């Protein structure tokens, strides 16, 4: 992974420390969300898309691309620990009502071949290999995410707080 060298962040940090806590938290939450956007876009591009079978379509409301559509960014301010948290989430119930409970299986573990039995019938499931899409997205877009977060802070301080950020240079070494 390439090193990221950002010049001028000491000035940004000093100015951020002088702001009220609520305003600082809002800026940092926005910066973290901006930093996660390139990673989210790469995860959406890498995400495997397939048709669900009829049973899963009925039981869980699945549709083609439900896993891809369940990728989202969440951000909040934890008042107890005074920190900003941003997460890139995949799975769970999506906006369209599909329950993508299997996201961790596709990303991490896959499924071993096994047999299924019901009503005196037996079927062999061939299993599947994991198809990671979140980790490769993070690996490929980490630098762009850091630059996007720093750029967001720079623009936000210039527009909303009147700080002259023209001398702050951002770039990858």
Give the positions of each predicted feature:
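Short, low-complexity, charged/polar segments at coil/turn and helix-coil boundaries
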Residues: 2, 14-17, 23-125, 155, ...
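Small-xxx-small helix-packing motif
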Residues: 8-9
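Exposed beta-sheet edge/beta-hairpin loop segments within beta-rich domains
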Residues: 126-148, 157-158
């Amino acid at each position: 992974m390439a090193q990221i060298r950002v010049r001028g962040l000491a000035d940004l940090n000093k100015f951020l420390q002088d702001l009220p806590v609520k305003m600082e938290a809002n800026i940092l939450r926005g910066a973290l969300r901006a930093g996660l956007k390139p990673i989210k876009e790469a995860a959406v591009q890498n995400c495997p898309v397939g048709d669900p079978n009829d049973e899963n379509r009925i039981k869980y409301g699945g549709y083609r691309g439900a896993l891809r559509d369940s990728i989202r960014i969440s951000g909040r301010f934890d008042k107890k620990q005074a920190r900003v948290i941003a997460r890139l989430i995949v799975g769970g119930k999506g906006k369209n009502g599909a329950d993508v409970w299997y996201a961790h299986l596709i990303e991490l573990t896959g499924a071993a071949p096994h047999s299924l039995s019901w009503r005196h019938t037996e079927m062999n499931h061939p299993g599947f290999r994991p198809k990671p899409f979140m980790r490769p997205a993070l690996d490929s877009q980490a630098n762009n995410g850091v630059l996007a977060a720093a750029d967001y802070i720079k623009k936000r301080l210039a527009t909303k707080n009147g700080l002259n950020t023209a001398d702050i240079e951002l770039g990858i070494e």
